[in-house]
Amino acid sequence: MIRLNWLFRSSSVLLRSQVRLLHVGDANVLHSEVDKQSAEYKENAREMASLVGDLRNFTSQVLKGGGQKAIERHTSRGKLLARERINLLLDKGSPFLELSALAGHELYGEEVVNSGGIVTGVGRVCGTECLVVANDATVKGGSYYPITVKKHLRAQEIAQENRLPCIYLVDSGGANLPRQADVFPDKLHFGRIFYNQANMSAQGIPQIAVVMGSCTAGGAYVPAMADESIIVKKQGTIFLAGPPLVKAATGEEVSAEDLGGADLHCKTSGVTDHYALDDEHALYLARQIVSNLNLSATNSYNDQLMHSSQVNFQTATPPSAVEEPRYDAEELYGIVGPNLTKSFDVREVIARIVDGSRFTEFKKLYGETLVCGFAKLYGHTVGIVGNNGVLFSESALKGAHFIQLCAQRKIPLVFLQNITGFMVGRDAEANGIAKNGAKMVTAVACANVPKFTVIIGGSYGAGNYGMCGRAYSPRFLYMWPNSRISVMGGTQAANVMAQITEDQRKRAGKEFSEEEAQKLKAPIVEMFEAEGSPYYSTARLWDDGIIDPANTRQILGLSLKAALNNAGQETKFGVFRM
């Protein structure tokens, strides 16, 4: 009996120990409280699915480039389309993270400039992450509109920040002449492309050009300033002035091929280094150049991540070592709806993004409207900052503290934005919301680690700044299709303008009727509604693309992998007003 009791007691102790170990092992797992049978969840899921459907429709349209006739004209010359070229350039089966696919969306009225006339993104070539810029000659002859320049420069900025080799697939007629005032003369116009090339080359970031079509006027400097350049026989041309301008200026009549073709530049001028017989050969040569860059190939994201770009290439398989989230990413549709007045717990979003849905929260009981903590993303430690309401002083102080920790430990930061702004009012001001908010903004601005931002809801006012908006140089910034971005909400802006007008009328001894107020408010609300749209934002490159919420984990993983080529430097903070 005694022995039996001892065995029973021992078994109980062992059982309790196992339960405790299991509990401790799962202590940082986020447990979802989402009710998938609730009316709100189902309504959100329907509405978000509709928004994602719209996104897919818009994306499918831009993939058509300049339209069927332009595509037929282009391919009849034996030329591949821009995205086909990228597909052949990249390692087979590897993902391509296309950026700003909807740049230029409805930006020029009846002029359709799909993808801004240029395809940019990050992909893997011979085991090395590279930044690819490919002109789409089916869109206005590949000419540079203002948005084309902006998108090209943004791609180079990403390459420089993350130390990614640049591969330019050139097929462009140069600057769009009718819009030359917005393309040519200013600091961040066309000339900055070549400035960036020169400086990146000086920093040891390889610059490779593949001339697969026209390369005219200033555009001729893309291959001329590249570390190595390739040109395609009887297809690629490079000249500062084309045949019409040469004839007008000198009276000389010359063909494009004789003026600047592959034979001239490979055999006589020396502008190009490699002679390609066709597009496929040129892309093979480009891969050979990358293979000889003498860069240590990192663990490619092809080995770590499932493909989720906007280009439908083959799917890459993630390794078994990576712990997938415990919850289905498509549940995000039901958690976050288009009605931004309805609150949700950002932890439910985090649980569907990070490895194993594991999240070690920082200062959980303090400043509860800001959620901060550590997690793994494809095996890499990241710090996550997510909104759960308006930012109070306590929230801002907590955020500043956490960002400092990540900067000190060189841990990348992920910001999940759904923010109406900082708290306002007499009590908030008395409690120092201005200086405490400034601490968080300072921390975000100075933290010299890779930062990534996803706008999952609202992005309003100074809250955009505190949560690493575009002005704070996140390495990549994405938006969900339900998101909104404005200095404030349309209704609030309309009420402010109406109040100012009413006060002005009163001082002048005049009345301001309710009818007049409504007449004033309506166009303001309409304007803010239009300009707050994620499509308005992405058309102007205020972000790096609108993404399907269900792909957030994969896209952040691809972005993180690219950024780890330059994991950041020592952080120095300025003065924090105490």
From Swiss-Prot:
Keywords: ATP-binding, Ligase, Mitochondrion, Nucleotide-binding, Transit peptide. The keyword Mitochondrion applies. It is an enzyme of class 6 (ligase). Residues 48-305 form the CoA carboxyltransferase N-terminal domain. The lineage of its organism: Eukaryota, Metazoa, Ecdysozoa, Arthropoda, Hexapoda. Disulfide bonds: none annotated. Pathway: Amino-acid degradation; L-leucine degradation; (S)-3-hydroxy-3-methylglutaryl-CoA from 3-isovaleryl-CoA: step 2/3. This is Probable methylcrotonoyl-CoA carboxylase beta chain, mitochondrial. Carboxyltransferase subunit of the 3-methylcrotonyl-CoA carboxylase, an enzyme that catalyzes the conversion of 3-methylcrotonyl-CoA to 3-methylglutaconyl-CoA, a critical step for leucine and isovaleric acid catabolism. Vital for adult survival.
